[in-house]
Amino acid sequence: MKLQVAFDDLSLEKLDSILETSIQDIDIVEYGTLSVIRYGLNHLKEIREKYPNANLLVDPKIMDAPEKIARSCYESGADICTVMSVAGLKTCLKVLNIAKEYGKEVMVDLLNDLDPINTAKKLDEAGFDYLCVHSSTSDKNSPLNEFLEIKKVVKNAKLSIAGGISLENIDEIVKAGPYNIIVGSSVYNNENPKLVIDKFKEHLKWNT
């Protein structure tokens, strides 16, 4: 089971500081949506240059111009790029085609999908690498129940789970059996991010 840390609402200085102390313990480094908007893809390039072996995910949440955005992300050093399932299958497939061109991967985010179970089944059959079951920061509901239903229909894609995951509920999340767990503010809003990352990793080891 993998730990993905999403770096969104924080300064570049703090982002870089956390990576310096904990890059070896983060399985997937997520350059989050807010980082993309605030700092652009140039800083992603710098992260790639500094950490050539890191598994980097960039989260532009593609809805439009899929080929141009995906190409820019992969050329900036991303290993994985995100697209929204609500953008439609055709748009998602355009991102997948660009990913294949670069030998990279795609994560489809199911956030706000009105029919997530059927959508997940179709995306899985279409050959997408990752599917993310996700509740937004404005939604206080846990993504766990939806994840368990989607897990029943997905055969091949790697299932990710995100939204409100903390050290208080991590064991319950781990027992659901995702491929990777996505955490963010619970790490970078803590006074000791490295300690929190280490604790998350311990829980993943205990339960797998």
Where are these regions (language model features)?
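Conserved N-terminal beta1-alpha1 strand-loop-helix module at the mouth
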Residues: 1-67, 75, 116, 167, ...
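Catalytic beta/alpha-barrel core
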Residues: 8, 28-37, 55-63, 79-90, ...
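Glycine/Thr-rich beta-alpha phosphate-binding loop at enzyme active sites
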Residues: 34, 119-149, 195-196
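Helix C-cap/helix->beta junction micro-motif
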Residues: 51-54, 102, 154-157
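Catalytic cores of alpha/beta
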Residues: 64-76, 114-126, 154-155, 165-183
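Expand to "…catalyze enediolate/carbanion chemistry for C-C bond making/breaking, isomerization
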Residues: 74, 80-82, 97, 101-110, ...
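Glycine-rich phosphate-binding active-site loops on the catalytic face of alpha/beta enzymes
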Residues: 78-90, 131-141, 176-200
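C-terminal helical cap(s) of enzyme catalytic domains, especially alpha/beta-barrels
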Residues: 95, 99, 150, 174, ...
